[in-house]
């Protein structure tokens, strides 16, 4: 199985789990709360990963023209679970479409404009984006549990889900 297929499946799996985390918030108010010592709410984390993937996968790799508002991702303090889920679903659609149409050999190419002084290998950058998404998914899950007292996991499916035919 190709690296591209595995990375695509991982990103989609983590985004699906993030949507479940947002939906598991009992109300829209919890979505924007933080615990002491925590800077970002579940809502901010959701908007951030959605914007991050729309920008880097959709725009930088796929040429979508998406214009990112990173400041809004971290400064928004209200909104509905449905709105955050819609942003995550839109990012999921972009990831799915962009990576499904990406030729495998493009993974060996480089991406410019991410860092000011160097080009990044696309395959390595996609792995980084998966780790970044998983990191924030873990933060969102832990924060939701702390704020609600609900210890129910919304985590991604086991690795076998990445190996099965989509």
Please give the residue ranges for each predicted region:
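Short secondary-structure boundary segments
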Residues: 1, 35-46, 78-93
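Acidic/histidine-rich alpha-helical segments that form the ligand environment
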Residues: 76-113, 120-134
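N-terminal leader segment of winged-helix/HTH proteins
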Residues: 1-8
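Short amphipathic alpha-helix starts
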Residues: 21-22, 95
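Glycine-rich, flexible loop/turn motifs
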Residues: 26-28, 70, 103, 107
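Short, contiguous alpha-helical
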Residues: 8-12, 16, 22, 29-72, ...
């Amino acid at each position: 199985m190709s690296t591209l297929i595995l990375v695509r499946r991982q990103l989609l799996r983590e985004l699906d789990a993030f949507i479940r985390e947002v939906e598991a918030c009992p109300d829209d108010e919890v979505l924007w709360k933080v615990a002491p010592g925590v800077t970002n709410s579940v809502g901010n984390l959701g908007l951030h990963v959605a914007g991050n993937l729309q920008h880097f996968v959709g725009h930088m790799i796929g040429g979508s023209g998406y214009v990112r508002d990173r400041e809004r991702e971290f400064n928004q303090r209200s909104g509905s679970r449905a709105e955050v889920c819609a942003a995550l679903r839109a990012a999921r659609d972009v990831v799915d479409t962009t990576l499904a149409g990406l030729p495998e050999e493009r993974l060996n190419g480089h991406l410019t404009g991410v860092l000011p002084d160097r080009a990044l290998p696309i395959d390595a950058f996609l792995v980084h984006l998966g780790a970044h998404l998983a990191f924030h998914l873990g933060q969102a899950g832990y924060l939701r549990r702390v704020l609600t007292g609900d210890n129910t996991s919304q985590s991604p499916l086991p690795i076998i889900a990445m190996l099965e035919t989509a």
